[in-house]
Amino acid sequence: LEGQEFFDKLLEELNVKYLAFQEDLAKIPKTGPFILVANHPLGALDGVIMCKILSEIRPDFKVMANFLLTKIEPMAPYVISVNPFEGRKEAYSSMSGMREALRHLSEGNCLGIFPAGEVSNKNNEFHEILDKEWESTALKLIKKANVPVVPMYFHAKNSKFFYSASKIHPDLQTLLLPSEMVNK
């Protein structure tokens, strides 16, 4: 399976249902470059849903996401990979992803990003499920690209256990993401 067939089958197998309002979809530019910015409450599933929705409207859509998604062959054409596990933000694989993203936009295409760079959690002063502050690299990309920015919001959350575990150690959050994906 590939493209829309892949996204449809994956979401069906995971029993994931989502709602996208037509009046919001109508605001997505049909031509020209833009950056779609979104919160990141679920993990990989956000990227899958984003690709499903946007690639129906814009076949040139790609998302900047975890390089592991490119290991899923039908996802690879939609992903500009970055490595969120690097200690140094300036590491080569993420910088090459940044260059690829800018090239993709300069060719008139559209790009989705999760500017916080990691999945939302409750480890904040409000004890609410929130994205952390946007990564400086995301802000630099937006500024350097100088294209319209379109917001997308996922109204979703992971399990209570996920948020509790992330308080114990942040890496537990990462380890639990695959199980969260299949338990929606």
Annotate each predicted stretch with a short phrase:
Residues 88-98, 130-136:
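Active-site glycine-rich loop that binds ribose-phosphate moieties when present
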Residues 1-37, 47-49, 56-58, 76-77:
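Membrane-anchoring hydrophobic helices of lipid-metabolizing enzymes
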Residues 35-91:
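Catalytic core of membrane glycerolipid acyltransferases/transacylases, capturing the structured
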Residues 107-118:
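A structural motif
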Residues 110, 122-184:
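A cross-family acyltransferase "interaction/gating" segment
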Residues 53, 103, 140-141:
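Hydrophobic/aromatic ligand-binding patch that stacks against planar heteroaromatic rings
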Residues 97-107:
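Short amphipathic alpha-helices and their capping/turn segments at secondary-structure boundaries
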Residues 47-49, 74-76, 115-116, 122-127, ...:
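A short secondary-structure junction signal
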